[in-house]
Curated annotation (Swiss-Prot):
<comment type="similarity">
    <text>Belongs to the LpxK family.</text>
</comment>
<dbReference type="InterPro" id="IPR003758">
    <property type="entry name" value="LpxK"/>
</dbReference>
<dbReference type="GO" id="GO:0009244">
    <property type="term" value="P:lipopolysaccharide core region biosynthetic process"/>
</dbReference>
<keyword id="KW-0067">ATP-binding</keyword>
<keyword id="KW-0444">Lipid biosynthesis</keyword>
<feature type="binding site">
    <location>
        <begin position="68"/>
        <end position="75"/>
    </location>
    <ligand>
        <name>ATP</name>
    </ligand>
</feature>
<keyword id="KW-0808">Transferase</keyword>
<dbReference type="InterPro" id="IPR027417">
    <property type="entry name" value="P-loop_NTPase"/>
</dbReference>
<keyword id="KW-0547">Nucleotide-binding</keyword>
<keyword id="KW-0418">Kinase</keyword>
<dbReference type="GO" id="GO:0005886">
    <property type="term" value="C:plasma membrane"/>
</dbReference>
<dbReference type="GO" id="GO:0005524">
    <property type="term" value="F:ATP binding"/>
</dbReference>
<comment type="pathway">
    <text>Glycolipid biosynthesis; lipid IV(A) biosynthesis; lipid IV(A) from (3R)-3-hydroxytetradecanoyl-[acyl-carrier-protein] and UDP-N-acetyl-alpha-D-glucosamine: step 6/6.</text>
</comment>
<dbReference type="GO" id="GO:0009029">
    <property type="term" value="F:tetraacyldisaccharide 4'-kinase activity"/>
</dbReference>
<protein>
    <recommendedName>
        <fullName>Tetraacyldisaccharide 4'-kinase</fullName>
        <ecNumber>2.7.1.130</ecNumber>
    </recommendedName>
</protein>
<keyword id="KW-0443">Lipid metabolism</keyword>
<keyword id="KW-0441">Lipid A biosynthesis</keyword>
């Protein structure tokens, strides 16, 4: 990893730590947070009052998003939700912004797409679910293009986009991890994009450290469970995580909350060395060349960015499955069958 990449990763870690407490750093930024909150409130009000019109794309929309900055487990939640909706008789499609990709117009994502042209999360969703996936910074345009290409799709899941109010939605699901709302301040003084009091249909909390849920209405536990690791060069070759226990292991993650990935591996009985990479790390070169380890465990989100040129036999990919509460699935299905987009 380059010096700039290492500096960025350390900066992300430092800011995230500061956002967990009401430090002098956070208080100094509260005037900017107030300005940010005012702008966000005006934008919400414009759509709530009808001054700006949300666009109904013709089918129900479920938005899976967050009110905080950083990774909370949205992507595995979207994958699990698509599978659950399909099991309930729906034909789901997925739209996403395509963060990190050079996308300006609606673009279809297939399992054969490149991460640079699709975005790492949309590509992972396409590969894991087989559902139609379209990306565009304008999610309305992405949804309309998806429907035109796949008229059988009867529900759209939006990967993120909670603040993309122009896209009318039927259900809003907000995902938190163990950090919840951090220090409770809005950006840039804290991690919140919107107040914790923001309306949503349900809240999911992914907390590997505690089984307790916050006292919020319609709140459900979100369990993320690692599966057997698969070899990057030979995907059919799989090993239970327990088999790595007596090896020199490096865990690396270029995701929004790398420590959560490391905690998952520790909970599985491993004691790896760890390396936090910047979120959406591009892997322009191999940052592991000088690491004297037997195995390197990475996330699925990082794996989709590594092409055939990566010939490091030490690389293993750890898949993660999200277990959704059956009551949450029932709530979503009921709302989809009983309400139109608004």
């Amino acid at each position: 990893m380059s010096a700039a990449g290492g500096l960025l990763a350390r900066l992300e870690t430092r800011v995230t730590r500061e956002w967990q407490r009401r430090s002098a750093f956070a208080w100094a930024l509260t005037p900017f947070a107030c300005a940010f909150g005012l702008c966000a409130a005006l934008r919400r009000t414009a759509y709530a009052r009808g001054w700006k019109q949300a666009v109904d794309v013709g089918v129900p929309v479920v938005v899976v998003g967050n009110v905080t900055v950083g990774g909370t487990g949205k992507t595995p939640t979207v994958i699990a939700l698509v599978d659950a909706l399909r099991a309930a008789g729906f034909t789901p499609g997925v739209v996403s912004r395509g963060y990190g990709a050079n996308v300006k117009t609606p673009t279809a994502v297939t399992p054969a797409s490149r991460a640079g042209a699709a975005g790492d999360e949309p590509l992972l969703i396409a590969r894991r679910t087989g559902a139609p996936v379209w990306v565009c910074p304008d999610r309305v345009a992405a949804a309309q293009a998806l429907r035109a290409a796949h008229p059988d799709v009867d529900v759209i899941v939006s990967d993120d986009g909670l603040q993309h109010y122009r896209l009318a939605r039927t259900v809003e699901l907000v995902v938190f991890d163990h950090r919840l709302g951090g220090n409770g301040f809005l950006l840039p003084a804290g991690p919140l994009r919107e107040p914790l009091s923001r309306h949503r249909d349900a809240t999911l909390v992914n907390d590997p450290y505690s089984g307790a849920l916050p006292p919020w209405p319609d709140t459900y536990s979100l369990a993320l469970t690692p599966g057997a690791a698969w070899h990057l060069d030979q995907p059919t070759l799989r090993r239970p995580l327990s088999q790595f226990a007596n090896e020199r292991v490096l865990a690396a993650a270029g995701i929004g909350a790398p420590e959560r990935f490391f905690a998952t591996l520790r909970a599985a009985g491993l004691a790896p060395a760890t390396r936090a990479l910047p979120d959406h790390y591009a892997f322009a070169d191999n940052p592991f060349v000088d690491d004297a380890v037997d195995a390197i465990l990475i996330t699925e989100k990082d794996a989709v960015k590594l092409g055939a040129s990566w010939r490091d036999a030490r690389l293993w990919v750890v898949p993660v499955e999200a277990a959704l509460d059956p009551r949450l699935i029932a709530l979503v299905v009921e709302k989809l069958r009983g309400r139109s987009p608004a």
